[in-house]
């Protein structure tokens, strides 16, 4: 019987099957950061338990760490306590890898794991963070979990899960100039909606997806949760294997050969049946910009802000009206006439070396517009930062008027010093544009790194295809 990739991943990890369709699944990799782990470790201690398999753990602080003035430490007392608690917990119990604050390898977990080869095809990967779906780029069954589940995985190395339906999102054809994985992700969400993937595990396929680099695939899978799906993944191919070879925690020698032989089975079989299939033409996808307070509120950069009056569904119409009021926008305003205040290039969605190269290629020889108050470039990890500096990208950003920062989650979310002030509008390469996501009253527009760079130069949203 032909199987989907999801079928294979699920069946390979079932420890016990319940009659109601739920199953106890074994967890291969547990990623831990400072925000969702303190209560879990405390629960273990109160119960007199120890972690079941510390060799599954990869940990680093990322949400609360500052991205500048590291010599001053972490000023906010709550943030400092969370980071210090993570440090104490991991030093007590151990881990496969721990990259503490100021370690040259620290950074955003969803960047650090893959670049170190700690995310390998066929794994189940969990983390107390909703964007764990990023790791699905490696044909992993990866998803976010809550704090109580973090404790459960620490104690048992298992999770009780209900099987999802399957969806294939196929993007066929060749992407045009200036169109990136981020644009593909936003176009998909704009097509299926933020609830379109609810209850599904999404496999991304098609010639355009196969043409993406691993970093592009990570961007795509990172956004799966924004389409309602806990899981998003891409089948293994030569691109996957070539990326992993020689990474610190990748297998070596004969073990590598055996691993590769297994990894090459991690694809949907010919004739495998999906519960839903969605197909997009790559040629139809243009650079995207969100206009509202949900990732599904997105249009092409050459479009206008939608008019709620044209929406027949009263619930959707009301949501659009509220979003426009919060965002301070009027219907039918051309996207390329919307001025910005700040620019953020970073986050677990778009802070890898290819993202920084992409933005730098637009910025080189140009400068941030006078109306832009702040432009941040925040590498996703210390390793990415060092690579970018070796290539001279930091000099390009600084010459263009950007601040070149230390690694961390930064302005993706208002849990550290990098945030928007009320009413400020930001071109952001992050993954969520909810009300207050980047700071109370802040207005977030999601774009690709290239589009963020183009907006920084113009002082408003601009079509990056015109400057490439």
Swiss-Prot record:
Cofactor note: Binds 1 [4Fe-4S] cluster per subunit.
Any one GO molecular-function label of the UniProt entry: 4 iron, 4 sulfur cluster binding
Annotated pathway: Amino-acid biosynthesis; L-leucine biosynthesis; L-leucine from 3-methyl-2-oxobutanoate: step 2/4
CDD domains associated with the record: IPMI
EC number: 4.2.1.33
Keyword annotations of the record: 4Fe-4S, Amino-acid biosynthesis, Branched-chain amino acid biosynthesis, Iron, Iron-sulfur, Leucine biosynthesis, Lyase, Metal-binding
Binding site for [4Fe-4S] cluster: 348, 409, 412
Cofactor: [4Fe-4S] cluster
Keyword Iron-sulfur: yes
Catalytic activity line of the entry: (2R,3S)-3-isopropylmalate = (2S)-2-isopropylmalate
Keyword Lyase on entry: yes
Enzyme class: lyase
Coiled coil: none
A Pfam family matched in the record: Aconitase
GO biological process: L-leucine biosynthetic process
InterPro entries: 3-IsopropMal_deHydase_lsu, Acnase/IPM_dHydase_lsu_aba_1/3, Acoase/IPM_deHydtase_lsu_aba, Aconitase_4Fe-4S_BS, Aconitase_4Fe-4S_dom, IPM_dehydratase_rel_enz, IPMI_cat
Entries under Gene3D superfamilies matching the protein: Aconitase, domain 3 (3.30.499.10)
Ranges annotated as spanning the membrane: none
Domain of life assignment: Bacteria
Family: Belongs to the aconitase/IPM isomerase family. LeuC type 1 subfamily.
Subunit comment: Heterodimer of LeuC and LeuD.
PANTHER family named among the record's database cross-references: 3-ISOPROPYLMALATE DEHYDRATASE, HOMOACONITASE, MITOCHONDRIAL-RELATED
Function recorded in the entry: Catalyzes the isomerization between 2-isopropylmalate and 3-isopropylmalate, via the formation of 2-isopropylmaleate.
Name listed for the protein in its UniProt record: 3-isopropylmalate dehydratase large subunit
Lineage: Bacteria, Pseudomonadati, Pseudomonadota, Betaproteobacteria, Rhodocyclales
